Amino acid sequence: PSVDTGILKFLAFEQIFKNSLTGLPIGGAKGGSDFDPKGKSDFEIMKFCRAFMRELYQYIGARVDVPAGDIGVGAREIGYLYGEYKRITRNYDGVLSGKPYEFGGSLMRPQATGYGVVYFAAEMLSQELQETLEGKTCCVSGAGNVALHTIEKLQQMGALVVTCSDSEGTIYDPRGIDLCVVRELKGNGARASLEGYATRVPGSVYTAKADYPAGGHAAWHYPCFAAFPCATQNELSRTDAAKLIENGCVAVVEGANMPTEPDAIELLQREGVLFSPGKASNAGGVAVSEFEMSQNASMEKWDYDKVDRKLQELMAQIYKRVSLTAKEYGCERNFVDGANIAAFKRVAEAMILEGV
């Protein structure tokens, strides 16, 4: 409900450079609505999606603009939007990504952003610190698609994830977040409060938003090796950054778009904490969207292993591109500057070659 034109323009600008870092032939745009799905029935959400597409369809196309899901928009909503698009245009093409697999979606699209975040983190830690995620304690914020799949992949790599959060509060589970419980609370449109986790899992602690540390977020006030902000913009403050540093955190890897406040980034970098901006580390989602577009265009279906392999390779390439650019411009290990310079150069060079 807080979406406005200013936010969308800013995110569209960022999307251009995120897409640029992938090296894939995609531009960048953003769209959205201030419709709040909380408390709405499936039928009400479907009605809205259909009405939205009736206004949107003339501005999008497989070779024009291909919208994808984001906050509040998952496979269900994409399905409603795509169904209305087909009814209006009678076209079956790759005009939306993140579609259900049954009619044109790609395997791994729901997992792509979260998995990509972890693949980027693993590559960065391996190259910069000769470390792995196995056996490491990690903090994650959020309980949406990106956060849940970030937690899932971290656990698959042997990490112990001890936090997750929603708009009402944060769960800390020292034995490791039980994804089955979180999905029971948040899955299939349930969207129940994470407070229910504490009643189901003995030993876990729930902190309501009203009880958060002054100027901070409870998810970042526990000891961890790496932190993964995966919820929303400006969720990790300077206060949080100071606490992470105090607790021995060595890396912060953004899963959400711009979740870390600028003064927090400055502090983390000054203290030697590896920091990856979202335009680099969360590019996995848009990458697999492009994979989906490629499959739609060629009328193919890739198997899971192929998509996963290509995603891992692409995230490693993004890390390498960002890291080498940072070194080239005298700002080694500054992945913010490295990402911005690498992305801007590719866009600028393309514009010059096209005579823009």
Task: List the predicted regions and their residue ranges.
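Flexible, glycine/charged-enriched surface loops at secondary-structure junctions
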Residues: 23, 60-69, 92-94, 129-137, ...
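General beta-strand structural signal in soluble alpha/beta enzymes
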Residues: 64-68, 92-96, 140, 163-166, ...
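Short, surface-exposed connector motifs at secondary-structure boundaries
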Residues: 60-63, 132-135, 222-225, 244-251, ...
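Rossmann-fold NAD(P) dinucleotide-binding segment
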Residues: 211-224, 234-251
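Glycine-rich phosphate/diphosphate-binding loop of Rossmann-like nucleotide-binding domains
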Residues: 105-223
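Adenosine-phosphate binding glycine-rich loop
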Residues: 124-125, 243-356
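N-terminal ligand-binding/catalytic initiation module
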Residues: 1-107, 346-354
